[in-house]
Amino acid sequence: MRLHYITVFDPSRSTNENDTFKQLLLFHYFGTTDSIPSLNEKLSIIGVIQGIWSLTSSCVNKDGEDLEKIIELNNDIIFCIKVESRFFISLAISNISDDQSAIPLQYLSAYLWLSYRFFKLLNGSFSGFNKDFRKLTDLLNEFVIPFWNDIYLNLETVTNRSFTVMWPGFYKRANFQHSSYNPGEKNNVEESWDAIILQNILLDKKSYLGLKDILVYHLPKRTKAANRESMGTKTYGLVRNFTSDLNTLPDISNWLYHLHCTYGEISSHILTGNVHFKEELQVEEEQERSRDTNGRDEEESQEQQRREHQETTQNNTSELSLSERVIHNVTLPISFAYDAIHEVSTTTGVSGSLSMIMDYVPKPHWPFISSSNKSADKNNYSNSNDNANSNAPLMAQSEAVGGTIGNSRFGFLISPLNSDLLPSSYQALKLNLNFENSKDKEDFYNCLFWYFDDFLIVIVCDPDFNKICERDYLKDLSFQLCQSMECLNNEILNSQNCDNVESFAYVIRDNVTKEIDSSVPFGSPKFTSDESISTLQLAINGIDQFINDNSNSLSLANWNPITIMGGSNAISKKNTTEGFGNGVNDKTQKFKRKYLNFLNLMSAEKLWDLQVDVLQFLTSLQNSKRDPDYFQEERLLKLNNGVLCYIKENNSNLIIIIKNWFQNNGTSKAAKQRNRFSSDSSKGSSLFQSLGRDVTDWWESREI
């Protein structure tokens, strides 16, 4: 299975046979092709798609805005969706006939919807560009092509979030409920973490009506290292937000989940869309390129020395330090590469935003901060925080990066504290959000991003709220968030010892709130989309390595180096590794509550086979006849290796429970449980009761 091409077109822009080319907004082939398709070939493909769509829709009385179809054409399978009543987005895949481990079509169809929702979140709706379709084409090139090219290079992107990715209009919530967790045992004297945010931030007179909402996410890293602990995925997702009228909550949540699961972490570069996969050069290609450039190395070296000498003689009064000149010399090759990349991207019309590399590289003519001023700023920040909370001393590394509390790291990823030399998206990321109670409902809001270990905070600000540009306000905001997240971290992760492995996993989809509560582990086996694809690496990784390794340099004091969310900066220090590490001794990285179930002990291959089996049952359930006003389907299925799957669907929710029957205490005990609850119909059906007491007790605790 491999991605073949993707196209976006609008048939309404064509009025006759002579201007059919106007309807084509985007057409991109993945990988290498033997010959470049002509415009007529592209138009013929979208013409066939329109014809089949019209034929199959002729008997359907529906507006068509949320329609989707799967079309088989020659050796391709084409996923096609219609959005905003007139725009079509089509994705074609090929080479699936002999692929026994092919990805189910539901995953790719869901990601086609997600790609549209993400584009709308970042750039606005397609219909908003009615007066400037050229700009729409440019934005489609800058977002859609890199988005799907990352999937083409790493096909497991569409499957690594388990069932939660199949429903693009829903979002996953974090669930910290555990058999050992009793909310009544909390100390009521201490202020809760969400009360701190509500009272000290949202309702504070400085922020009132300026901050629209605060979204709190728990995004722990997945780790396969033997010396690192893993945590159940039931805690992954949105912890909570503080408004009930944010209609685009599923979109912003799924966008963050996609970024985190695709690249393995969250950083400033990733949030601003400046990170994508690329193929590492093969050894032969590197050697050939080296031979081609050896003849130019000596001339470039002489020219570089001549320019450096002229610059030094012309700037004798600038008094640049040795470290500053070294930084300048090191970045010269990057500037040469940037010029070439920028020229190619300009002529092809692809990815203008990805050619901003030199904006991220420090230059020697910046207003550098002396070491004394830097120390003074650190002392002032530390003293102000000590006065606010003497029991939690804060050690600030940088006003933009943040600091540490014990073994925890915190700081802003996106905020006005970042250097003005960076693009504006690093100061505030504009997202197209829809608030039900707002006048315009849908508008672009300034969003700041802040992290505390594995917790990511999204601060949604009104476009006219200028308080976020004040340094003191952001410092105070960071301090209040630190207090809140420290309470949350202690409450849900380290409150009680419990490392039990549950004998069941579940997925609950609420059709009213659009929430998904799931404990099914993430992950899938490796899918090779193309044998010609070599090892992958992140395109911005080299710049991140350069920035972080030199974060203590005087020439970078005003640079505010970009950080990565999590307990440790996985790139900057050689002693850190991937996972939950905080750059300290591994012995301290022990979680008292891990939220694991028996599926966490399965291999990726067996877990994937289980997901495919459950997906087949879900498909058969959805294809069955049902009353649109009221229906209820309930099934208990036996899978391989003694695994039971309970599925129940009605108008309000979908419930999937995967039970390891071998870990039950015996069928006799289950029979007793059935007799115990048989007289009380409110406890559930006999099929549900047969899952065992641990499942029924868990369900009763949810209802409480």
Swiss-Prot record:
One GO BP annotation of this record: cytoplasm to vacuole targeting by the Cvt pathway
Main location: membrane
Gene Ontology CC entries for this record: cytosol; endosome; intracellular membrane-bounded organelle; late endosome; Mon1-Ccz1 complex; multivesicular body membrane; vacuolar membrane
Region of interest (Disordered), ranges: 281-322
Top-rank lineage group of the source organism: Eukaryota
Topology in the lipid bilayer: Peripheral membrane protein
Compartment(s) of residence: Endosome, Multivesicular body membrane; Prevacuolar compartment membrane; Vacuole membrane; Vesicle
Keyword Nucleotide-binding attached: no
Entry keywords, A to Z: Autophagy, Endosome, Membrane, Protein transport, Transport, Vacuole
InterPro entries associated with the record: Ccz1, CCZ1/INTU/HSP4_longin_1
Transmembrane segments: none
GO molecular function: guanyl-nucleotide exchange factor activity; phosphatidylinositol-3-phosphate binding; phosphatidylinositol-5-phosphate binding; phosphatidylserine binding
UniProt cross-references to Pfam families, sorted A to Z: Intu_longin_1
Functional note: In complex with MON1, is required for multiple vacuole delivery pathways including the cytoplasm to vacuole transport (Cvt), autophagy, pexophagy and endocytosis. The MON1-CCZ1 complex acts at the fusion of vesicles with the vacuole, through its regulation of the SNARE complex during the coordinated priming and docking stages of fusion, and particularly at the stage of tethering/docking.
Family: Belongs to the CCZ1 family.
Misc remark: Present with 2870 molecules/cell in log phase SD medium.
Subunit record text: Forms a complex with MON1. Interacts with YPT7. Interacts with YPT10 with a strong preference for the GTP-associated form; may interact with other small GTPase Rab5 homologs but at much lower levels.
Name of the molecule in the record: Vacuolar fusion protein CCZ1
Organism: Saccharomyces cerevisiae (strain ATCC 204508 / S288c) (Baker's yeast)
